[in-house]
Amino acid sequence: GIPEGKLNVAYPVIESFRRYIEYNDIKVEVYIDKGVPLGVGLGSSGATAAATAVALNELFGTGLSIGDLIALAGEGERAVAGEAHYDNVSASILGGIVIVNPKNPREFFRVEPHNLEVVLFLSKSRGAMKTRSMRQVLPRGIDLSTTVYWNWTVSKFTRALIENDLKSLGEAISEGGIVEEIRARYVDSYWEIKKAALESGALGFNISGAGPSMFAICRSGQGHRVLLEVKRRMNVEEYLELLVTSIDLHGARVLS
């Protein structure tokens, strides 16, 4: 289930907010109706942290900038991963696809992709893999030639986003390198599922977050075909839930 009290990622966000506005005498109760499965690589902790930051800003009328909200929500991620990181919280706050400076969360840009569907391969093993532990299995460094290649891949990804070049975007997403190679060891039938999805028309495929869930991107209208073809080829429904969705363009918002 969802951790309570100080163990929940909402708590450090509240504490950071309290320090930020320099007003300690505030008391809030946070009730979480979790719509995102826990510990499967979908950014569930980031979703909670982002929603908490946005809700506090609205509740107290503090008028924090988007960059401030991202920095604030990142403190919730610190509790989960051992260090603040802003990729999930920035996208949860802003919607769309967000590229954010890992050293300065107030520096970011946002892109709205068009004509894109996402096929999610959700692990039914809830809470099986934690961000912190899946970071620990990665190497501490990579060689120069690999670094140069990954700079190219990131550049390709960014250009494809800006130009809405879905073919190039899919190619860049599919290039997971050493991170994909290592984390794939912890995902059942990963390479077989990836091959089936790409051969069925997916433009790109990779592990979602720290795993073990996966995702594929497709042109609009192609997602269900990919989903059905992967199901036809492989018996994945015992351990995966498959669904087709799109990228939310609104981000965290007040509902009532």
Specify the residue positions occupied by each region the protein language model found.
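ATP-binding N-lobe of GHMP and related small-molecule kinases
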Residues: 1-40, 58-66, 247-256
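DPxDG-like acidic metal-binding loop motif
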Residues: 40-66, 93-95
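Short, structured patches in soluble enzyme cores that scaffold and shape functional sites
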Residues: 93, 115-125, 246
